[in-house]
């Protein structure tokens, strides 16, 4: 068996010191050193084999964090792991104490194609770090070769044009990597979908002294449409892999909870209990239902392409009732996700592996909207999540 861990880590605006990433937002050298220190320590604590990072402005800044984590791994191992001359060095507990550095790991960085480098107008990219390397060069998906046109259905009659939504590019890149783990190659997608922050047209809705509720509602609508369209672009890429029989894992900042429409677009439909109860799409009478054979076919077609939430699988098998990766305004929710194809589902007969545990690193999170709560802008405003996976077959 082969064991590995895979994690999602939104680092919150990683860029070097004295560089204005958003308007009037920079890190002093002292702040940058503190942030780098915290990130390296968090990466060391996680000790994940595969990490998807979001909100990376500079590859060099991330590489510095990774290098520092490797140095600390050496120091920690020297202090914690007994010398091999000791008779008890073979005890399993000491294997758990050891932390592998990332010196031999490979890093794939996807810069944001909309990032011009102009101070105050920067756009973040993302990255994947893999101790297993990559079986082929990772692929960046952002500017679409053909615009995505989403037509709206006519509500009455035979209207020629009920309107449509057009998407030419996703707001932040999607990074696709094929990673060799044990005797398998797993396709990993890292994403950061459009946030709920409204997209405002002109200065009016953005000027809070001239509050424009309709303009702000329209901004929220634009953001929601974009996020769901980006989810569909990601879903299209996921299906290309699944339909080739490839195991898939999807991670990142979805900016929505598990049951949001955008997340359900990514995961695909959950099969209905029995399609033989359903009225056929071409029914001629009220008793015209799908057959048992069609029910089996439909269920398999949907199940084969459905992704499963690592968090949900963990909650189902444990007594834990709450995992969260963000806190704001009294709302604690998970908007960072790890999804996986049925190749890793414990009830799938032909599974290649399954998740043994799920970790959430969220002790640093506080709800900054509460006056009594501490808040530190230098740490991440997201919790990190990690799935502990076991593959069947292969060397341990």
What residue ranges belong to the model's regions?
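Beta-strand-turn-beta hairpins that frame and shape the catalytic cleft
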Residues: 1-6, 133-136, 170-212, 394-396
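N-terminal, active-site-proximal structural segment of metallo-dependent hydrolase catalytic domains
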Residues: 1-126, 207-211, 352-354, 358, ...
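A long, amphipathic alpha-helix that forms part
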Residues: 217-245
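Short, flexible helix-coil linker/hinge segments at the edges of structured domains or between repeats
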Residues: 142-164, 194-222
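Metal-dependent phosphoester-hydrolase catalytic domains
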Residues: 59, 129, 133-140, 146-152, ...
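Short, solvent-exposed loop/turn elements at domain surfaces
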Residues: 14-19, 197-199, 347-348
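Catalytic metal-binding/acid-base residues of hydrolase active sites
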Residues: 12, 56-57, 192-194, 254-257
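A well-ordered secondary-structure block
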Residues: 113, 118-121, 125-182
């Amino acid at each position: 068996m082969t064991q590995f861990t895979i994690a999602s880590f939104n680092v919150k605006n990683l860029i070097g010191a004295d560089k204005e990433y958003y308007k009037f937002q920079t890190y002093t050298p002292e702040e940058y050193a503190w942030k780098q220190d915290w990130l390296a320590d968090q990466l060391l604590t996680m000790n994940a084999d595969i990490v998807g990072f979001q909100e990376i402005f500079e590859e060099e800044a991330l590489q510095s964090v990774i290098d520092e984590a490797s140095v600390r791994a050496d120091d920690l191992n020297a202090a914690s792991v007994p010398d091999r001359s000791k008779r008890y060095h073979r005890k399993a507990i000491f294997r758990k104490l050891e932390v592998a550095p990332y010196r031999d790991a490979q890093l794939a960085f996807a810069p944001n194609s909309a990032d011009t480098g102009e101070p105050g107008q920067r756009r973040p990219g993302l990255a994947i770090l893999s101790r297993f390397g990559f079986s082929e060069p990772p692929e960046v998906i952002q500017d679409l070769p053909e615009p995505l046109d989403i037509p709206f259905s006519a509500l009455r009659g035979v209207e020629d044009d009920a309107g449509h939504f057009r998407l030419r590019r996703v707001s932040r890149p999607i990074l696709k990597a094929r990673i060799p783990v044990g005797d398998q190659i797993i396709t990993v997608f890292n994403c950061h979908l459009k946030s709920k922050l409204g997209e405002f047209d002109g200065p009016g809705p953005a000027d809070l002294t001239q509050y424009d509720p309709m303009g702000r509602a329209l901004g929220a609508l634009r953001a929601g449409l974009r996020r769901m369209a980006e989810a569909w672009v990601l879903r299209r890429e996921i299906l290309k892999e699944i339909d080739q029989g490839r195991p898939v894992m999807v991670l990142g900042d979805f900016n929505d909870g598990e049951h949001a429409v955008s997340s359900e677009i990514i995961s695909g439909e959950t099969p209905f209990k029995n399609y033989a109860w359903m009225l056929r799409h071409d029914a001629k009478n009220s008793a015209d239902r799908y057959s048992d054979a069609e029910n089996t076919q439909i269920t398999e077609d949907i199940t084969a392409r459905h992704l499963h939430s690592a968090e949900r699988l963990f909650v189902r098998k444990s007594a834990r009732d709450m995992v969260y990766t963000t806190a704001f305004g009294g709302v604690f929710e998970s908007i960072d996700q790890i999804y996986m194809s049925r190749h890793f589902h414990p009830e799938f007969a032909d599974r290649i592996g399954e998740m043994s545990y799920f970790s959430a690193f969220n002790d640093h999170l506080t709800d900054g909207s509460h006056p009594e709560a501490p808040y530190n802008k230098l740490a991440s405003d997201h919790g990190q999540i990690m799935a502990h996976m076991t593959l069947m077959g292969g060397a341990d």
